């Protein structure tokens, strides 16, 4: 037995981070300002492995690329019908399909962050072909993913703001499966010369309008969470004039005169890359509220076990003793519930534990993020959390019981209208008070880029400089946004 233990320990000791978590490690390696040569080499091998994983998968693409437009329109029509059925069921009183609570929705936002924060990355390598009309459509898609340089339209900027406004920025500890899609997209970004058909195919799949996007947008708004990042994709991915149409055009424009069948086979393989790793529905389906609360408190216990005094005893132990071993967290929660510190399935305001977290003199103020507080709140509230259904259960007397928490939370759009009404009389003098043309520390980076661009000897050199600043790691920065605006003007 001892020999086996030593052998296992020795083997684990020599495993590299890439071997343990290949997708996560590659993801962050490729998000460096200038990815190292070994990271780029690993990216190519990683794509080969992921493409091999798609070979047994069935594909719904037509065998002939000439049938793609009909396929796309039929798919869009089916999604539309399913969404209308969803809306009808909700109107009839059905609960939300995806998010049982606000914490569930925030769990989802956090879980898909590695993918959303590299939105559009797979097309980056095609920018090098800006003067080749065969690639006009995918380059236009990339520019639109970047908001054409406008921060309020740049998809990564929007998602960063969405995470920050909901206390969900701490996502880098997610499991390796959560990084697969992001790693694929970044690997494609730096290997366009070797995987062009696969990029075209991946783009075709990614830009189709999925049912989950429509439902997600609807339910986020219902829960008071800004759905704009998702509704923006609903509009730009349309099959009429949007990214879905451009993605289809990209297939036809890139199709070679010879070896069309071989090219299209690779397009189909790239299309299937969309099916790998954790996706929207799998992340949503993996939510376990109680387990998330247990994991959260176990993580906090690593510091918490040192900072609590010993005068408060729960279940015969002080708090530090409970927190000394993360495995004791489930029993600790049971003890707090048994002694009245936590009152499940009641308004959390009735629980002493919750008042320690949130209140006028909350002793644990600042310990938990907004997302973590929402997890604890919804777990304590239990059956009182509103699922969106008109009636969710019967009480002991057989009468309908309606969830009351929150008390029919305002949708995000309703909150937005209230804020706009409050601000109508308030003038914004910031722009008028600013000195026009004055460079300060906030815009020095953008000013430096303009100077570098002015020194470039040719248009080609200028475009190359801009492309460097439009990488997945840079495009959402101040200089990256400026580079995108300038590139967009020159390209169009």
Kindly label every feature range from the protein language model.
Residues 2-492:
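Non-heme di-metal
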């Amino acid at each position: 037995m001892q020999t086996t233990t030593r052998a296992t320990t020795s083997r684990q000791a020599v495993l590299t981070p890439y071997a343990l978590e290949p997708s996560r490690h590659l993801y962050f390696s490729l998000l460096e300002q200038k990815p190292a040569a070994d990271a780029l080499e690993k990216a190519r091998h990683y794509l080969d492995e992921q493409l091999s994983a798609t070979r047994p998968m069935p594909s719904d693409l037509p065998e002939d690329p000439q049938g793609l437009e009909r396929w796309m329109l039929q798919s869009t029509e089916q999604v539309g019908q399913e969404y209308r059925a969803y809306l009808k069921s909700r109107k009839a009183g059905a609960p939300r399909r995806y998010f049982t609570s606000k914490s569930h929705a925030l769990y989802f936002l956090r879980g898909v962050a590695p993918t959303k924060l590299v939105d559009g990355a797979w097309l980056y390598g095609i920018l090098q072909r800006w003067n080749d009309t065969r690639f006009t459509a995918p380059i236009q898609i990339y520019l639109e993913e970047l908001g054409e340089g406008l921060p309020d339209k740049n998809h990564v900027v929007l998602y960063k703001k969405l995470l920050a406004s909901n206390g969900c920025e701490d996502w880098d500890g997610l499991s390796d499966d959560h990084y697969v899609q992001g790693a694929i997209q970044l690997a494609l970004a730096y290997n366009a010369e070797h995987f062009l058909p696969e990029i075209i195919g991946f783009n075709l799949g990614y830009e189709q309008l999925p049912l989950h996007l429509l439902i997600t947008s609807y339910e986020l708004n219902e829960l008071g969470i800004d759905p704009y990042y998702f509704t923006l994709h609903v509009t730009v991915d349309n099959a009429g004039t949007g990214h879905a149409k451009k993605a289809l055009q990209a297939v036809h424009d890139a199709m070679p005169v010879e070896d069309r069948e071989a090219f299209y086979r690779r397009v189909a393989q790239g299309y299937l890359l969309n099916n790998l790793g954790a996706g929207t529905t799998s992340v949503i389906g993996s939510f376990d509220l109680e387990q998330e609360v247990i994991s959260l408190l176990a993580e906090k216990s690593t510091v918490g076990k040192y900072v609590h005094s010993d005068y408060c005893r729960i279940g015969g132990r002080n708090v530090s003793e409970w927190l000394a071993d993360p495995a004791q967290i489930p029993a600790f929660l049971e003890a707090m519930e048994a002694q009245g510190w936590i009152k499940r399935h009641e308004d959390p305001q009735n629980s002493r534990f919750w008042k320690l977290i949130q209140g006028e003199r909350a002793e644990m103020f600042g310990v938990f993020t907004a997302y973590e507080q929402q997890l604890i709140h919804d777990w304590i509230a239990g059956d009182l959390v509103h699922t969106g259904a008109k009636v969710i259960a019967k009480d002991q007397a057989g009468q309908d019981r309606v969830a009351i928490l929150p008390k029919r939370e305002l949708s995000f759009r309703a909150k937005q209208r209230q804020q706009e009404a409050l601000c109508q009389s308030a003038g914004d003098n910031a722009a008028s008070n600013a000195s026009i043309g004055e460079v300060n520390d906030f815009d020095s980076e953008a000013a430096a880029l303009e100077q570098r661009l002015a020194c470039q000897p040719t248009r080609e050199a200028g475009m190359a400089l801009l492309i460097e600043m439009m990488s997945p790691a840079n495009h959402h920065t101040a200089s990256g946004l400026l580079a995108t605006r300038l590139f967009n003007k020159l390209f169009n």
